[in-house]
C-alpha cells in the first residue's frame, strides 16, 4: 500500500540530490494533496456566570480556590480606601462637573484650519486689509529708529542661531527658530536708550489665555499656549479712526459654502465658559502687545501651511484682544468705545508674517454691524537660504558658509512692530 502520492515521492526523492539526505525542504508539489490552513484556533469560551431568572449560579467563591466544573464568580470592584493616582479611573463624561449638553468648538495651537485665513475671518467677524498700517510703516522708514550697524547685527543673529550656538552640522528647525526670534527681540531691546518707554514692557514665555464667544448659534472658544508674548503697562493706540470703523458695516464677510465654518475645530462637551487673559488681577503688565508664534516642527507633515499659520495668528490675536476687552468692558456684546489692538508675528525662522489686529466690537453673533479689522503683511523673507556647510567644487569654494539672499527690510518691519506704541 502506497503511503504517499506520486508528486510527494518525487519531491522527497529530489531533496536527496541537494545533499539533504532525503529530508530537505520539499518542493511545491509536496503540498498538492492538501491546503495548509492559516486560521488560528478559536479562543476558549469565557467563563461567565449566566444570569437566569429564578436560578442562583453555583460558583467556587466559597471554596477559595479554582474549581473547573463550577462557574467563575464575579467579584465587586475592590475599594482601596484611598485615592491612588496610578490607578485613577475618570468618571463617565455625563457625570463630569463641567459637562454641558451644548457642544463647544475649540481652537487651540494644534488646530489647522482647512480654509485658512478665510475661515479665521468668518469666525472672528473681521475685515482683512493687505499690508501694514501707515502708522507702523512710518516707523519702518524713519532712520532715527534704525540700530547702529543694523544689517550686520541681524546677520550675526542668523549665523548664531543656525551655526554658532549648536554642535550639529545642520541644526534642526526646533533648535534655531526660537533662537532667532529671541535674539531679534533682544536686538530690538537695545533701542531702550532712544525710547525709555520700552522699559515698561516684559516678554513672557508660554503664556496662556482663553476667550469664548457666540457666532450664529455656535459656541466658540480659543485657547492659546506656547510662544512668547510681549505685554505692556500701556495699551497700544487705536489704528483705524471712527469713520473707518463705521465704514466696515458695509463689508460682506466671505463664505465658503458647502464647507462648514467649524471644520477642523475641536468639538467638546466638557469645557468651562471663561475669558482669561492669563494673568492675575494686579499684574503690572496687563495689556497684550505682540504675540510671537513659531512654526518649529522638524517633520514636513507636522508643519503649518503659510495660510494656516496666518489664520492661527488672527485667531490668537483676536482671542487675546477679546479676553482683554471682556476684562475692561464686561461681557455685554457691544461696539467698543476704545478698540483693543494686538499685534502678532509668525515665523518658521526664515519666512515672517506680520499682523495688526484691532477689535472693534464684541457683538459677534450676527454678520451685520461693525466688523473687526486685521492688517496682514505675509511671506516676508528674512533670508533665502543658509549654507551650514561650504559648497566646494574642484577644490574651489563656490558657496561659503552663511545666509544667502538677506532681506534687511523684513527686520525693519519686525523692529517697527516692536517700537509701535513707544516711538
From Swiss-Prot:
Please state which protein family the record places this protein in. Answer: Belongs to the mitochondrion-specific ribosomal protein mL37 family.
Encoding gene, per UniProt annotation: MRPL37
**Which is one Gene Ontology cellular component term of this protein?**
mitochondrial large ribosomal subunit
Where does it live in the cell? Answer: Mitochondrion
Q: Does the keyword DNA repair apply?
A: no
GO MF, one annotated term: RNA binding
List the lineage, top down: Eukaryota, Metazoa, Chordata, Craniata, Vertebrata
- Any GO BP: mitochondrial translation
Keyword line: Mitochondrion, Ribonucleoprotein, Ribosomal protein, Transit peptide
Entries under Pfam families matching the protein: PDCD9
From which residue to which does any coiled coil extend? none
Q: How does it assemble?
A: Component of the mitochondrial large ribosomal subunit (mt-LSU). Mature mammalian 55S mitochondrial ribosomes consist of a small (28S) and a large (39S) subunit. The 28S small subunit contains a 12S ribosomal RNA (12S mt-rRNA) and 30 different proteins. The 39S large subunit contains a 16S rRNA (16S mt-rRNA), a copy of mitochondrial valine transfer RNA (mt-tRNA(Val)), which plays an integral structural role, and 52 different proteins. mL37 forms a heterodimer with mL65.
- This chain belongs to the protein called Large ribosomal subunit protein mL37
Amino acid at each position: 500500500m502506497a503511503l504517499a502520492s506520486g508528486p510527494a515521492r518525487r519531491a522527497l526523492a529530489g531533496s536527496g540530490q541537494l545533499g539533504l539526505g532525503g529530508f530537505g525542504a520539499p518542493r511545491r508539489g509536496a503540498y498538492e494533496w492538501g491546503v495548509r490552513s492559516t486560521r488560528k484556533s478559536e479562543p476558549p469560551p469565557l467563563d461567565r456566570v449566566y444570569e437566569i431568572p429564578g436560578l442562583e449560579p453555583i460558583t467556587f467563591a466559597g471554596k477559595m480556590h479554582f474549581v473547573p466544573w463550577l462557574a467563575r464568580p464575579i467579584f465587586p470592584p475592590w475599594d482601596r480606601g484611598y485615592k491612588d493616582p496610578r490607578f485613577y479611573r475618570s468618571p463617565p463624561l455625563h457625570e463630569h462637573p463641567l459637562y454641558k449638553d451644548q457642544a463647544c468648538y475649540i481652537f487651540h495651537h494644534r488646530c489647522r484650519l482647512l480654509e485658512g485665513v478665510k475661515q479665521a475671518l468668518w469666525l472672528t467677524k473681521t475685515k482683512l486689509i493687505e499690508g501694514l498700517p501707515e502708522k507702523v510703516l512710518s516707523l519702518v522708514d524713519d532712520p532715527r529708529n534704525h540700530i547702529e550697524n543694523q544689517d550686520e547685527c541681524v546677520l550675526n543673529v542668523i549665523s548664531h542661531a543656525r551655526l554658532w550656538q549648536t554642535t550639529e552640522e545642520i541644526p534642526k528647525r526646533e533648535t534655531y527658530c526660537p533662537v532667532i526670534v529671541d535674539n531679534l527681540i533682544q536686538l530690538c531691546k537695545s533701542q531702550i536708550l532712544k525710547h525709555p518707554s520700552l522699559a515698561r514692557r516684559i516678554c513672557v514665555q508660554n503664556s496662556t489665555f482663553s476667550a469664548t464667544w457666540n457666532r450664529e448659534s455656535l459656541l466658540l472658544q480659543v485657547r492659546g499656549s506656547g510662544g512668547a508674548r510681549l505685554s505692556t503697562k500701556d495699551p497700544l493706540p487705536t489704528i483705524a479712526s471712527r469713520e473707518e470703523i463705521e465704514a466696515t458695516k458695509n463689508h460682506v464677510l466671505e463664505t465658503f459654502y458647502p464647507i462648514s465654518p467649524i471644520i477642523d475645530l475641536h468639538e467638546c462637551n466638557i469645557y468651562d465658559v471663561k475669558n482669561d487673559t492669563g494673568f492675575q488681577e494686579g499684574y503690572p503688565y496687563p495689556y497684550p502687545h505682540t504675540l510671537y508664534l513659531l512654526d518649529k516642527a522638524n517633520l514636513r507633515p507636522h508643519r503649518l501651511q503659510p495660510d494656516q499659520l496666518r489664520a492661527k495668528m488672527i485667531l490668537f490675536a483676536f482671542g487675546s484682544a477679546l479676553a482683554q476687552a471682556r476684562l475692561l468692558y464686561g461681557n455685554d456684546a457691544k461696539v467698543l468705545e476704545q478698540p483693543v489692538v494686538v499685534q502678532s508675528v509668525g515665523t518658521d525662522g526664515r519666512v515672517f508674517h506680520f499682523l495688526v489686529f484691532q477689535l472693534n466690537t464684541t457683538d459677534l453673533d450676527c454678520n451685520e454691524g461693525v466688523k473687526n479689522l486685521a492688517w496682514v503683511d505675509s511671506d516676508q523673507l528674512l533670508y533665502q537660504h543658509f549654507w551650514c556647510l561650504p559648497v566646494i567644487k574642484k577644490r574651489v569654494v563656490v558657496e561659503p558658509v552663511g545666509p544667502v539672499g538677506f532681506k534687511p527690510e523684513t527686520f525693519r518691519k519686525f523692529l517697527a512692530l516692536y517700537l509701535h506704541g513707544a516711538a
